[in-house]
Amino acid sequence: LNLESAIDDTKNTAKLPRKYRTKLAPMTINEYYEMRHPLWIEKHKDFTLVTLFRYVGLDCYRVDVNVDNFKIIDMNTKDTYKCRGIYGSNEKHIAYDLMNHQHTILPVELVFPPLEDGVEKLAIDTNIDNIPMTHIVSLKDVLHKSPKIIR
């Protein structure tokens, strides 16, 4: 995969391809540190969206996400849900240097198959920026509902 080696999207100009535009998390650094688990799960009819949050502490931060490194395991049935892709991108692997976003929270949004009814406890295997982690979570603790838009 041949990506630009460094991206400065602080001005979010039209020249930057859409798949590289950086979306910042709708939270403060304090809210991030107060989270029990640095992730949200949104259940939709056709898919499950898992948003993992990463603190960007440096002026230049290497973002490296490969969908093959992510899975959800139902702790009761041992069913495994493999990551389908990165939300908003056709790429299965993205890697780039994020510049000028020091002290911000970066969301990594991953698409999974829809979770079966009755799923309560999950193990989420992650590997962002070559840091493997497993989060054991209760679905009700990390379930996030998007605000409604009323017209």
Which stretches of residues belong to each language-model region?
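Conserved functional micro-motifs across diverse proteins
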Residues: 1-151
